[in-house]
Swiss-Prot record:
CC per GO annotation: cytosol
Protein name: Pantothenate synthetase
Annotated InterPro entries: Cyt_trans-like (IPR004821), Pantoate_ligase (IPR003721), Pantoate_ligase_C (IPR042176), Rossmann-like_a/b/a_fold (IPR014729)
Origin species: Sodalis glossinidius (strain morsitans)
Residues at which beta-alanine binds: Q61
Catalytic reactions on record: (R)-pantoate + beta-alanine + ATP = (R)-pantothenate + AMP + diphosphate + H(+)
Gene designation: panC
Description of how the protein assembles with itself and partners: Homodimer.
Binding-site positions, (R)-pantoate: Q61, Q155
UniProt-listed Enzyme Commission number(s): 6.3.2.1
NCBIfam families from the UniProt entry: cyt_tran_rel (TIGR00125), panC (TIGR00018)
General function of this protein: Catalyzes the condensation of pantoate with beta-alanine in an ATP-dependent reaction via a pantoyl-adenylate intermediate.
Lineage of source species: Bacteria, Pseudomonadati, Pseudomonadota, Gammaproteobacteria, Enterobacterales
Catalytic site positions: H37 (proton donor)
GO MF terms, alphabetically ordered: ATP binding; pantoate-beta-alanine ligase activity
Length: 284
């Protein structure tokens, strides 16, 4: 497995692959890898000849410097996992390689349709950071395919819009959420949970599934459903952040024309911000 840290070496390698008519899959990550990331890699491998995993803790995606400093850096362990998984290349650049100048003077990429709603309201500037680093990676790697998890549903919609708007010739694959046996969605941030918090964390998915079941049964009193879910989470010891039911295509409030809904939940448990979602076909 190649471990590359600089754009010139990366470009040289992917150019050679392209000349050999190899399809390339890109899996962007911030490291601290788990089985959810492995599912992305497997999805990429099923669709391409070469798999590139980027490992870069993007400072533009963090609201607070202390959160950036606390994010786990586990590159050696990550590379060991990726070698076992048969990844062809890890691109692990230093921050100064990706952002050689001060961030205040950095050129940014923005996707206003999805950047300033829901998660974007809670985390100002976060999606601008995502769009900027993903655009850089797309330009450097020139992938045929890129894989993203459905756990971060808004991010997936956001990336698809970015690809449309910027005319990238890249197939975006959404990979289903990987869960622990008790239903908790796998996340690098689950490592922030204490043993007791980890015991409580599956309540997020359990409350979500109860709400989804009601939607599938035809319940459409959205405010009532969300109020009940909020109360259940509070009783379970979680602090609800974002609980919404939206059109799965537009992420706007449901209308009479909505065919599919997505239920988006985020809640705090200790220092961890948990994220989960589920899609529902609406009964006409």
């Amino acid at each position: 497995m190649l471990i590359i840290e600089t754009p010139p070496t990366l470009r040289q390698t992917v150019k050679q692959w392209s000349q050999e008519h190899k399809r390339i899959a890109l899996i962007p990550t911030m490291g601290n890898l788990h089985e959810g990331h492995m599912a992305l890699i497997d999805a990429g491998r099923a669709r391409a000849d070469k798999v590139v995993v980027s490992v870069f803790v993007n400072p533009m995606q963090f609201d607070r410097p202390e959160d950036l400093a606390a994010y786990p850096r586990t590159l050696q362990e990550d590379c060991e996992q990726l070698t076992r998984r048969g990844v062809d290349m890890v691109f692990a650049p230093a921050t100064g390689v990706i952002y050689p100048d001060d961030l205040a003077s950095q050129t940014f990429v923005d996707v206003p349709r999805f950047a300033n709603i829901l998660e974007g309201e809670s985390r100002p500037g976060h999606f601008r950071g995502v769009a900027t680093i993903v655009s850089k990676l797309f330009n450097l790697v020139q992938p045929d395919v890129a894989c993203f998890g459905e756990k971060d549903f808004q991010q997936l919609a956001f990336i698809r819009q970015l690809v449309r708007d910027m005319s990238y010739d890249i197939e975006i694959i959404g990979v289903p959420t990987v869960r622990a046996a008790d239903g908790l969605a796998l996340s690098s941030r689950n490592g922030y949970l204490s043993a007791e918090e980890r015991r409580l964390a599956p309540q997020l998915n359990q409350v979500l599934m109860r709400l989804v079941a009601q939607l599938r049964e035809g319940e459409r009193h959205i405010d009532g459903l969300l109020t009940s879910a909020t109360e259940q989470l509070l009783q379970a010891g979680l602090r609800p952040d974002t609980l919404v039911i939206r059109d799965a295509q537009t992420l706007q409030p449901l209308t009479v024309d909505s065919r599919r809904a997505v239920v988006l939940f985020t809640a705090w448990l200790g220092k961890a911000r948990l994220i989960d979602n589920a899609q529902v076909d609406l009964i006409s």
